[in-house]
Amino acid sequence: MGWGSRCCCPGRLDLLCVLALLGGCLLPVCRTRVYTNHWAVKIAGGFPEANRIASKYGFINIGQIGALKDYYHFYHSRTIKRSVISSRGTHSFISMEPKVEWIQQQVVKKRTKRDYDFSRAQSTYFNDPKWPSMWYMHCSDNTHPCQSDMNIEGAWKRGYTGKNIVVTILDDGIERTHPDLMQNYDALASCDVNGNDLDPMPRYDASNENKHGTRCAGEVAAAANNSHCTVGIAFNAKIGGVRMLDGDVTDMVEAKSVSFNPQHVHIYSASWGPDDDGKTVDGPAPLTRQAFENGVRMGRRGLGSVFVWASGNGGRSKDHCSCDGYTNSIYTISISSTAESGKKPWYLEECSSTLATTYSSGESYDKKIITTDLRQRCTDNHTGTSASAPMAAGIIALALEANPFLTWRDVQHVIVRTSRAGHLNANDWKTNAAGFKVSHLYGFGLMDAEAMVMEAEKWTTVPRQHVCVESTDRQIKTIRPNSAVRSIYKASGCSDNPNRHVNYLEHVVVRITITHPRRGDLAIYLTSPSGTRSQLLANRLFDHSMEGFKNWEFMTIHCWGERAAGDWVLEVYDTPSQLRNFKTPGKLKEWSLVLYGTSVQPYSPTNEFPKVERFRYSRVEDPTDDYGTEDYAGPCDPECSEVGCDGPGPDHCNDCLHYYYKLKNNTRICVSSCPPGHYHADKKRCRKCAPNCESCFGSHGDQCMSCKYGYFLNEETNSCVTHCPDGSYQDTKKNLCRKCSENCKTCTEFHNCTECRDGLSLQGSRCSVSCEDGRYFNGQDCQPCHRFCATCAGAGADGCINCTEGYFMEDGRCVQSCSISYYFDHSSENGYKSCKKCDISCLTCNGPGFKNCTSCPSGYLLDLGMCQMGAICKDGEYVDEHGHCQTCEASCAKCQGPTQEDCTTCPMTRIFDDGRCVSNCPSWKFEFENQCHPCHHTCQRCQGSGPTHCTSCGADNYGREHFLYQGECGDSCPEGHYATEGNTCLPCPDNCELCHSVHVCTRCMKGYFIAPTNHTCQKLECGQGEVQDPDYEECVPCEEGCLGCSLDDPGTCTSCAMGYYRFDHHCYKTCPEKTYSEEVECKACDSNCGSCDQNGCYWCEEGFFLLGGSCVRKCGPGFYGDQEMGECESCHRACETCTGPGHDECSSCQEGLQLLRGMCVHATKTQEEGKFWNDILRKLQPCHSSCKTCNGSATLCTSCPKGAYLLAQACVSSCPQGTWPSVRSGSCENCTEACAICSGADLCKKCQMQPGHPLFLHEGRCYSKCPEGSYAEDGICERCSSPCRTCEGNATNCHSCEGGHVLHHGVCQENCPERHVAVKGVCKHCPEMCQDCIHEKTCKECTPEFFLHDDMCHQSCPRGFYADSRHCVPCHKDCLECSGPKADDCELCLESSWVLYDGLCLEECPAGTYYEKETKECRDCHKSCLTCSSSGTCTTCQKGLIMNPRGSCMANEKCSPSEYWDEDAPGCKPCHVKCFHCMGPAEDQCQTCPMNSLLLNTTCVKDCPEGYYADEDSNRCAHCHSSCRTCEGRHSRQCHSCRPGWFQLGKECLLQCREGYYADNSTGRCERCNRSCKGCQGPRPTDCLSCDRFFFLLRSKGECHRSCPDHYYVEQSTQTCERCHPTCDQCKGKGALNCLSCVWSYHLMGGICTSDCLVGEYRVGEGEKFNCEKCHESCMECKGPGAKNCTLCPANLVLHMDDSHCLHCCNTSDPPSAQECCDCQDTTDECILRTSKVRPATEHFKTALFITSSMMLVLLLGAAVVVWKKSRGRVQPAAKAGYEKLADPNKSYSSYKSSYRESTSFEEDQVIEYRDRDYDEDDDDDIVYMGQDGTVYRKFKYGLLDDDDIDELEYDDESYSYYQ
């Protein structure tokens, strides 16, 4: 049946058929994308800018993406975590930000581990060593037949086991605790990207799903010889793991993984990729591609990271690994698999990008790979290409150990040259034109480990890689079914461009775009100019996609080594595999060639020929031999290659064996290696490194490997810098910038911090939590410091920061005096003394710097405090003070002076001891390595440096004696030892605990006593009934009746004498109470029994009754308790229960009887009210008049008339004390147990008196303690007076206060008094000398005469700070002491070598000044001097002046001081009357002025003008500081008033007010913020912009709170109160996942508030049955009716949290008085209402004038614009927000074409990226761009999209780029 007959259905079925067919075709194509709430963003400007933008649009900046600079990981908590629709909301306007260059919402990518599970039932776990069974690593005796293996043992025999090489497995984690992996595990090569931590341990489950990474790791680096399981190929390599497959795999996750620690990791092994389902086309997204590029360019210090990839397991699905962008990349080494037999495994894919192969499994019966497995086990069932890639990684590790300098391309070249076909079975083996045998199944063949290490040993780096892009014609060609399209392109290899010229090929990439109705029907081939044909794509049966290929890159390595130039032939075949619509043929739209390779032959002779040993010598110097011009016939230089030399000398080589080096005279010589400052370039040339590099791998500044002196290598950028960046320190030994500890902001060593990151404080050299002085933080709490430490950072004497009195801080330890090369620092700026290190040039010194030396090292001379290089003397000589060599003293081998104390080294026969050469070390030192070393300070003599190496002891530095015991000197001898006169501890006599000598014991051990005759210890033997006294060595009698007793207590018997009974460790003549005798012991009675025997109890304790030999509290039915007898007696036979034995004492009756007045009678005997039944008279008789009813007798009342109450069967008118009249029961009832007098059950009037347990009456009840809000007084709880919450003693003696009040000295007040602060509701006194504080230990302002520094008040500011408005402010970095913050405010310089001039610290005095030693400052010379030596002595004069004998410069020596020399009419002329000295007759030619006048430039004035002040020292008008309008001195802190635009704070003028102040425009001053504010915009508590410590900012109100109000939570990182999610009533953090309780219409479920109704509805009504009604139209979701109950707003609105109202963002053109709107400039995460601030009434008149003038100017400009617009003709319609199509795209394109530029960051093969033109930030013009289909759009910067406009912008691209 044809196509038409099958598809054309009649009628309505026609449409259904078409839809069914479309669905079937599109289903595989339209896979649902899953968008996450994570974004990748590229932002220029660093972390601060990224954080600002993230906060503005509601994102959280997780941090930089791996090693990708300027790429950040953003997370948005208020968007859906996983959605099939990309996120659209106000946060999407982040793309409009000028600094945002590119943004991409992350999409979940499916990645499959490339192992294959045959059958879980067949897996067997073994714990035995598996080496004999590891067939793929060696041929054992039981392996038959043994095929050619990978020669791994051969590499081992050559000494290579992977040592110092680091391999990381990118997978689902590795089990780092596995016994086979523990030894080689490398934490620096490991992290958990899925879990965002550093531990790569896999997630365990019942199925062991995450075993893959552990198996791969074992193949690489399982430890050898540990008797556990297997052996890794590189069993001495370091192994790490990156856990990244056990979660959502996104572009960011992959990029972070492949770029993890690239300077530490050498090889990355990955055994995963896109689905091997035969229909997927997928590869690295932009971030991962960038990470690959960065890895090969900068990883391994520029040598390039090595990426090893498994080729794929899609063989059964007819997959082709060219559709996998990871294995198809030039940056990865794609590894395939072969079975043991050499046959193709059934899972193997074919493709032209596979480089080589290793062993793995084949058929189910074939052997598989043995490796480590989860739960510390092993497996022999590892399969697939997953097993092959780690093998390759292990072999490459062996090669890198053999030659660590192999580049990433060198590794691929070595694999190409050493892999071999061997026994591998494939029908497509071919030999290319370069002589390499290659296959689509196995690449260049099976890897050979031994051959690789041998090749690596002699390898020379290949020339630089060239990239040639050959763009073919763009003519579209139609691909017909069952036919082929051929396109031929003649390539030149870019021969016209020497920087891109490719002659010898490596990788060849075809970049191709094809449209096709069924992608799986295509097959693509490429034929090289040499005739090598590569299959780039084979038919794929399951690929039904209609997408074709869009800029997809196919790669082949089959042309490796061939020439690039010539005809390249591309063939595209269309072979229909099933029926399809032939009306839509495929089209080859465009293709291009990208050729990678070198311009010269990549292999040097060293690589081509066997290595031979040759003698080398340096050839860097110029040749000095004078060669003649005749032909040279002698031997050539050893560095010439085998082609020899042609004269005239032996070094004139025809070709070099190793490298060419070009000398300064332009001649070339051959050298064995390039000299320092050069690198091995292409063509065997030595090229120069960048100027600062000592060694390098390229000529650029970011390709350094080591640096010249004075520079440090930044390991992250491979550049040489003079100063290391923040977060790193200078390693001066290795000239490196190394990273600081994670807590340091700056440091001098890894753990030696100098500045800490936020939230931590510097404790010595460590950053940790702050503790009070004398304590340190140990990670959990604050612990006391060592006794030497005043403050410390850790335990022990080495943890001191400052030392106690009598000790000095020296290099982190406390010493009693400064060591050699240290000096005592007199500054003591913090009150503690310290020893500072002398300058490196000094041996000893008395101060800092190189000018304070007091002695010098050997070979240097002391000159004016500086050590200068002396003469160079021979051994046995030294340099004397005149610089001459003199002979050392005879005992020295080398010395630094003439005496025997000046030795520096000794002869072999002598020992060096602190400058002396001695025959034996002094007694308090020991010899080690021919030097005397001091003993431990506790030893007098010793054999080593430790405290356990003493041989004798004496007194320590404090005069305390020490005693030797087992090599240690202790304060005293241990127990059982005594001290000899030689301070040695010897043992006491036997059984002696304390003694004076070996013969005299003073205390014996237990059980012994001192014999008075010989003072020895004799065993104490006590008689019967005696025991040893524990305090005295004697026998004491036991307690009476004891036969034996306890050593510790003679009263504790262990046995009793005859006639005594034992009970409770005592002996009794008769058994005590509550016991009875039984044989020789007393037995205790039962509980509550007073007397008993073995048969039972006789009587009971009070409150209990005897019943059948037992004691009971209640007797039970038929019995009552007889109080007198203490027994249970029987009731009357008629009673069920009773209170006595009588017939009328029943309380309940037997069945059939009725209770009547205490009697049980038959119903016939019931009486009338007021009468009772008389049994004797057998008739009714009247009750007593007081009874209402009675029983048995007239006076035994059972109820009473009204007004009377029943009490003990009598009626009383009032109840006695302890009872109360109950109207309900008509009887007197007992008060509660603790109550003495009451008027009701809970209406106590007086409590009982209980000695030792007082009770207090409160609101009718008795309490042992008065409740909160009351206090005890005379047995009554009285109420505290308001506003006390608790009080004591009296109503006003408060202990705590109600809300809104604070407690101060027992009184509740609204505010604390001055110099107090409220802490937890109690007023605490501020610290000493503190005027105002925010915490009891944190001062805010000091009292007069004191200054604030580090939150405390000091009498003076420490060095490096100056006093300003009672605050200590840091000086400029150049100043040691200063008077202000500027560089010209110094009073003392930081460096002692610097000089001071006009407050500036300079290296030397400037011209026109002289150095004054007394003040150590540079002073100005006289105006007439050009240079001078003092204030009145010129050394040279200004032009036109001459010097007189006194050193003064004058016009003419004949003229008087008030005259000048006239050159025109020679002679002396008088100065102007206003001048004292002058240069001419005019009044503006003065040099000095008379008294009461001041020199202003060259004019004398009475008063200085504005901007100047009178300098009385120089009698002139000097410039004020640039910030001052008027002043009293030159410094910035001597202003009287400020220039416009500056604000005055005290006497200082500032452009921006300091922290804690705000600028008041009306007064031009900096005014103090409210005490709770850190930064503010006004004086009120609601003007805060940031808060001080202990406060949190409520941004919506501008207030600082000690604790956040309801509906807010504390965000510690920003010190703010953040609003809970709109659905949360209370919460513990940001977002919808941290709720603690919910608002109405929501219920809590797992921290999330879930709506009770559908979206857009709210709940109405209580209980389980309720209704739901629609939300207000402005809300998307809500909690109630109306516009002010919203919980979620539409995309164009922002939720105002305080009133749950959805509002628009304010337009910049809206007037402040317009309707309510949100200020979205800073953030769209929360609505902050725009406020219109009222200007102060006191504003200057000039401000009002300015506003008026501005308004007039705006009106004039507005009028001009209107006139201009009218002249333009037709009015343009108002532009809608968003994008609109331009009318004529063809016309527009040319005008905007110049506005575009191509991306240089990513190749646009998978994702189309749109970029805007470059615009200035203030340019509001339309932005134009072109879409994929060529349509030109105009984009507007401001506003939101209308619903109608959105459709015009729909496109599928997931990334966007912007260049602003």
UniProtKB/Swiss-Prot annotation:
Residues making up the signal peptide according to the UniProt record: 1-32
Propeptide segments, given as residue ranges: 33-114
Residue spans crossing the bilayer: 1744-1764
Keyword Repeat: yes
Molecular-function GO terms, alphabetical: endopeptidase activity; peptidase activity; peptide binding; serine-type endopeptidase activity
GO terms (BP aspect): anterior/posterior pattern specification; cell-cell signaling; cytokine precursor processing; embryo implantation; embryonic digestive tract development; embryonic skeletal system development; heart development; kidney development
FU repeat positions: 630-680, 683-730, 734-777, 779-824, 832-879, 882-927, 929-979, 982-1028, 1032-1077, 1079-1121, 1125-1168, 1177-1221, 1225-1272, 1274-1318, 1320-1363, 1365-1411, 1415-1461, 1465-1510, 1514-1559, 1563-1610, 1614-1659, 1665-1712
Topology, Extracellular side: 115-1743
Site positions (Cleavage): 114-115
Domain P/Homo B, first and last residues per copy: 461-601
Glycosylation sites: 225, 381, 665, 752, 802, 852, 1014, 1191, 1290, 1497, 1685, 1707
Motif extent (Cell attachment site): 519-521
Gene Ontology cellular-component terms listed: extracellular region; extracellular space; Golgi apparatus; Golgi lumen; Golgi membrane; trans-Golgi network
Tissue-specific expression: Expressed in T-lymphocytes.
Entry remark concerning the domains of this protein: The propeptide domain acts as an intramolecular chaperone assisting the folding of the zymogen within the endoplasmic reticulum. AC 1 and AC 2 (clusters of acidic amino acids) contain sorting information. AC 1 directs TGN localization and interacts with the TGN sorting protein PACS-1.
Protein's recorded name: Proprotein convertase subtilisin/kexin type 5
Organism expressing this protein natively: Homo sapiens
Lineage: Eukaryota, Metazoa, Chordata, Craniata, Vertebrata
